[in-house]
Regions:
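Short, well-structured N-terminal submotif of metal-dependent ribonuclease cores
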Residues: 1-39
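Active-site neighborhoods of divalent-metal-dependent phosphate/nucleic-acid chemistry enzymes
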Residues: 74-107
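Acidic, PIN/NYN-like endoribonuclease modules and their adjacent C-terminal/linker elements
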Residues: 103-107, 113-138
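Hydrophobic/aromatic ligand-binding patch that stacks against planar heteroaromatic rings
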Residues: 29, 99, 118
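Short, ordered loop/turn segments at secondary-structure junctions
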Residues: 43, 112-113
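Residues at secondary-structure transition points
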Residues: 22, 38, 60-63, 87-94, ...
């Protein structure tokens, strides 16, 4: 299978980091092993900001968070995405769409209802974790 580029939203990446069990972790591990994650500075900054929230302290150590961010940073495809277009109700979601479009990503994977129900973008398929697992054969 050809290596594909995927943008995975912050909530899924954090879910995968907090629990090695379940669909988000299975997806992230599969993408890291066989495909490529895509980040823009805005999408990575959102992940960095959220993963350090104190509410996650009892689930993941600071060292593990640093290691995870380092691994993502080192293995990712980075895109220059300026001010995003207006695609969704939530402006923060637009950064993920913009990164996916700039990278010509295969999918944007999200559990966010706003993204999953965003007006159709001909160039981009927004899918759930389970849809991505099925499509990628994981």
């Amino acid at each position: 299978m050809t290596s594909l580029k995927l943008v995975i939203d912050t909530n899924i990446l954090i879910s995968a980091a907090l629990s090695a069990q379940g669909a988000p972790a299975q997806l992230v591990m599969g993408v890291l092993a066989r495909h490529r994650l895509v980040f823009s500075q805005a999408t990575f900054d959102e992940l960095r900001t959220r993963i350090y929230r104190p509410k996650f302290d009892r689930y993941i150590s600071l060292d593990d968070r640093e290691r995870l961010l380092g691994d993502f940073n080192a293995s990712a495809i980075w895109v220059e995405a300026g001010e995003p277009g207006r695609y969704c109700r939530d402006r923060d979601d637009d950064h993920f769409i913009e990164a996916a479009l700039k990278a010509q990503a295969h999918n944007l994977v999200s559990g966010d209802k706003d993204l999953l129900e965003a007006p159709c973008l001909q160039e981009l398929q927004v899918v759930s974790v389970h849809q991505a697992l099925e499509a990628l054969g994981f």
